[in-house]
Amino acid sequence: WDSPIMSKQFSERAPFKFKKFKKNSGFKFDFHGRKLVMYVLYGPGGGEATISIDSQAPRKIRFFDGYCSYYRMMPILIFEGNDGRHIVEFKMSDSKIDKRSILLPSHQQDFDKNPKKYEPANGYACCLYIVQ
């Protein structure tokens, strides 16, 4: 896990290390269960990822929303379905998000003052929870 700055910032609430995923990076794994949740960071440097599960159509998830002038931990429901073995593929996108238009008006001022802060399009993940 290679993001010591984020890991330190959230160490009191998450005694885990955060993995930083850049454009076109990701991982693939299988699990046995009926539900999968991933804890991630939403924030100004957040991007977009594609998640594929089994033979389902890929779907996009964002690590960015209207409040992302600061970083915060969020759980993301990756899968909920039949109990069994499932294959998950997670890959960061290289597409650019129009972050200013997503931010709430009260957070757009920060974007205007600090545009470089919003340039990265990364994903930060720290742990997966599997429910059987």
Please provide the spans of the model-predicted regions.
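Glycan-recognition surfaces in beta-rich domains, encompassing non-catalytic CBMs
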Residues: 1-132
